[in-house]
Regions:
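N-terminal hydrophobic/helix-forming segments and targeting peptides
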Residues: 1-230
Length: 230
């Protein structure tokens, strides 16, 4: 089995160079994994999927911006009289949470989800970014690029090779859900990423969160209005 542990920089700095023997006192046992799920019923059983993660809340943009924006999107959707499509919204631990959720719900998700977004890093005001699904040609991809083109013509386009969040699981071979990402500055592309400086003073701003919220809201509105009239 593989193992490892975390320690603070101050603790690390006290260690001298050399070899260490490590004793890890741990056990393997059946536990539990908790996640939040909200299903909003629309006229159709076809679903738009929103996923965000809740596993490392000390970081403002890389973590808290997603749940914050998704919470307000859920509030807005529940205030609408009735949407054309249904909505599946989940708050999960990153990676293991999406794997767990897929293991329990994959068949239902595959039958119902036709569009969706993984919501991460939507709180800064430095850029707008787009990360495609593995397919790159889903309605989620087309809508994301269309919306961002009008918000910021200079938005950053990443490739599927730049993936690093739960889109890895949702778009994995054999799963292939139509999930893209609309972000502000992408994870790993700002200097405060995965440090204590990813906070409300240095990275996340009210304007940044508002921009992240409206980018995804406009994408949802575009999907709702995307109809063929006879």
């Amino acid at each position: 089995e593989r193992w490892g542990f975390c320690l603070s920089q101050e603790q690390f700095d006290t260690l001298e160079n050399g070899s260490y023997k490590v004793i890890i006192k741990s056990t393997l046992f059946d536990g539990e994994l908790n996640y939040g799920e909200l299903l909003i019923k629309g006229k159709s059983d076809k679903e738009i999927f929103l996923s965000t993660y809740i596993c490392h809340p000390s970081m403002a943009n890389n973590e808290l911006s997603g749940p914050t924006v998704v919470t307000f999107l859920a509030k807005w959707l529940q205030e609408i009289n009735e949407t054309d499509f249904s909505y599946r919204i989940i708050f999960i631990p990153e990676t293991i949470g999406s794997i767990t959720y897929l293991s329990k719900n994959y068949k239902d998700m595959k039958n119902k989800i036709f569009a969706g977004f993984n919501v991460s890093c939507v709180g800064d005001d430095r850029a707008y970014s787009y990360l495609p699904s593995r397919n790159g040609k889903t309605i989620s991809d087309m809508i994301a690029k269309h919306v961002l083109k009008w918000i910021d013509p200079n938005f950053i386009k990443y490739s599927w090779l730049d993936r690093g969040s739960d889109e890895r699981q949702y778009c994995a071979p054999g799963i292939d859900l139509p999930i893209a990402s609309i972000l502000r500055t992408k994870y790993g592309r700002y200097p405060e990423y995965h440090t204590s400086l990813d906070n409300l003073e240095n990275v996340v701003t009210p304007k940044g969160l508002d921009g992240g919220y409206w980018a995804i809201r406009k994408a949802i509105e575009a999907i709702e209005r995307n109809k063929k009239y006879k």
